[in-house]
UniProtKB/Swiss-Prot annotation:
Co-factor binding comment: Binds 1 [4Fe-4S] cluster per subunit. The cluster is chelated by three Cys residues, the fourth Fe has a free coordination site that may bind a sulfur atom transferred from the persulfide of IscS.
Name under which the protein is recorded: tRNA-cytidine(32) 2-sulfurtransferase
Organism of derivation: Bdellovibrio bacteriovorus (strain ATCC 15356 / DSM 50701 / NCIMB 9529 / HD100)
Main location: cytoplasm
Record EC number: 2.8.1.-
Renumbered ranges of motif PP-loop motif: 40-45
More about this protein: The thiolation reaction likely consists of two steps: a first activation step by ATP to form an adenylated intermediate of the target base of tRNA, and a second nucleophilic substitution step of the sulfur (S) atom supplied by the hydrosulfide attached to the Fe-S cluster.
A Gene Ontology biological process term: tRNA modification
Transmembrane segments: none
Amino acid sequence: MKSAVNFELPLAVKIRKQIVQALNDFNMIEDGDKVMVCVSGGKDSSVLLALLTEIQRRSERKFQIEAAILDQKQPGFDVSKFKVWVESLGVPFHIVEKDTYSIVKEKVQGGTFCSLCSRLRRAILYDFAHANGFTKLALGHHRDDVVHTALLNMFYVGTTAAMPPKLKSDDERNILVRPLCYVSERDIEELAAEWAFPVIPCNLCGSQDGLKRQRIKKLVRDLEKEIPNIYASIQTSMTNIKPSQLMDQDLWDFKNLKT
């Protein structure tokens, strides 16, 4: 089946170049890699998957791409149309089935599901990737996610931390990469609308109101009206750390500072 994705759209070209920049800056994908793109059926990971296939076609590096989605057995989860779209890209597609929906609904009552759901989902996908010989896991987090996470940690946790572009998983068996780390959510939304691929809604987290991440997003979007480059500025600050100007004594020896 031929893909209906138009890779020559100006916005597709822009995002592809931003992905390539991230791949090069952080050495995300190397010759011989077997990359598992973790797709959710949403706009972010789907745009990533499609553009990685185009980058693969153009690249001198030889690497494999496959997609994997977790069927968590939540009501209304129908992967059939999305599966057809993924296969139209020429990408092998894995549906990993595990009922985490029942676990989350049972364990979390009266709160938000995201934290537990994410931990369970990660563990299952890490196991699948390791068992099937994948060398990299590509995640669909974009620039806005990185910025929102930094502020969430600062406001609610008291740490200066965000989403790194490349890291070793907690179980130390997998390398995770975030090729969309330079790409804005608005650009992804616009391209997804142009391509009009099938989207699988999340009836678990998508049904919750008042999430902290949503509050942070609204805050930054409101500030963006006064500070147009706020997302780029916050992200750039993460590449320009000055330990002597902070308060972490593990990074800077304040006690022994003398003239």
